Amino acid sequence: MKIRVGMGYDVHRLVPNRHLFLGGIKINHTLGLLGHSDADVLIHAICDAMLGAANMRDIGYHFPDTSAQFEGIDSKILLKRTTDLLAEKGWNVGNVDATICAEHPKLNPHIPAMKACLAPLMNVTQEDVSIKATTTEKLGFTGREEGISAYAVVLIEKMNK
């Protein structure tokens, strides 16, 4: 069986008057992430990791922020489309390991809902999706609560034909 690994990263600025979406779910917070789409940094990092593992460029190539088609789009749609793009090339997701960096809100209570939301979009079980939350101990832009970042590593497997 052929396997590959990809790594993804994304970051967005926190701003007022926006909803906060992380891992496909809406989280109550006083600020939201600024972006062309819903700015879900976790999903964007996972998409980049998937595309990188398959040597299919990156999320901006497939879903450019210059396109009106993707303005305000739900990132869950982008994740499902990314899963489909990989399947067209014969790849399945094996597992995901991701980390979200944010001072606030506290994210650990939301991780089970994130896993339940994301797993079916990638055709994997919740056991195949690891999501962790951490802070930067008040260092840098995330420490100053100016933004949220996410990192993801994805293993993909070549489908048997």
Regions inferred by a protein language model and the residue ranges of each:
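RNase III-family endoribonuclease catalytic core
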Residues: 2-112, 122
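Glycine-rich, mobile lid/loop segments that gate access to catalytic sites or pores
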Residues: 118
